[in-house]
Amino acid sequence: MATSLQAAATFLQPAKIAASPSRNVHLRSNQTVGKSFGLDSSQARLTCSLHSDLKDFAGKCSDAAKIAGFALATSALVVSGAGAEGAPKRLTYDEIQSKTYMEVKGTGTANQCPTIDGGSETFSFKAGKYTGKKFCFEPTSFTVKADSVSKNAPPDFQNTKLMTRLTYTLDEIEGPFEVGSDGSVKFKEEDGIDYAAVTVQLPGGERVPFLFTVKQLEASGKPESFSGKFLVPSYRGSSFLDPKGRGGSTGYDNAVALPAGGRGDEEELSKENVKNTAASVGEITLKITKSKPETGEVIGVFESLQPSDTDLGAKVPKDVKIQGVWYGQIE
């Protein structure tokens, strides 16, 4: 960038005119030219100072270049400063509730699940039927199973880059929670903000959209490891229209007239024309790492495996592995 600005400044430097000893160039109008412009030959004398005009113009360009450079440097400092701040401190549920909107806005706290202050590292709830409330699932990593960048390497889960905003946490999930006499637990999801649209990018540049969800989850097992399956809805609804106006419940049936058969591409055309909004299935494993019976709070970690978007049946879904932390209240 500095080289480009220097070249531009060099190009805009005033040219030296050796033909005239003075810096002013006097242009005398011709009688014919003067009449055509409505000027008298005796009074039509135009004087311009090329040197001073070009000098002023070059000075303005130089000032503009300095301002642009300062703006770029300031932007770099702001970006580096924002990255240096990192994730905010994880707060307890009561601490989050005590903050105002302006204290939470722009800090990243709204996308975090609460934590527990104190408590026990074992699950200390008595046997019985409870109600699970305020369940929160916060992903900390997204990996996608795809072909490796290196040759002759089998497909494996690869780290990704998040392309969407910090709005991927599931919250306010509730449902019946049961503790058996043998210490086992069972949870069934019934309501809450139980899905979030997320897009990640693979190292090769491919972007993978999917719905992070725990809809209709039914998990059971021991507190240190209880798992279950859940429903993964279609990323797009049946009324969504593709760029050619085709949809599941509305729009055109085909892109252009009726496709001719017998060419061996019927299946490919069918995938593009016949939109499939059927839901798929995912699986999640949860672990309780700390509990606090006096407040009814539990926290833990989870690992979920679910399919990605299929573009309404036109693409083969990829396996998405999501790891993170979770929080809940048991009453």
Curated annotation (Swiss-Prot):
Its main location: plastid. One of its GO terms (molecular function) is oxygen evolving activity. GO terms for cellular component: chloroplast; chloroplast stroma; chloroplast thylakoid; chloroplast thylakoid membrane; cytosol; photosystem II oxygen evolving complex; plastoglobule; thylakoid. Transmembrane segments: none annotated. Keywords: Chloroplast, Manganese, Membrane, Photosynthesis, Photosystem II, Plastid, Thylakoid, Transit peptide. It is a peripheral membrane protein. Residues 1-57, 58-84 form a transit peptide. It comes from the Eukaryota. It is found in: Plastid, Chloroplast thylakoid membrane. One of its GO terms (biological process) is photosystem II assembly. It holds the Pfam family MSP. Belongs to the PsbO family. Stabilizes the manganese cluster which is the primary site of water splitting. Regulates dephosphorylation and turnover of the PSII reaction center D1 protein. This is Oxygen-evolving enhancer protein 1-2, chloroplastic.
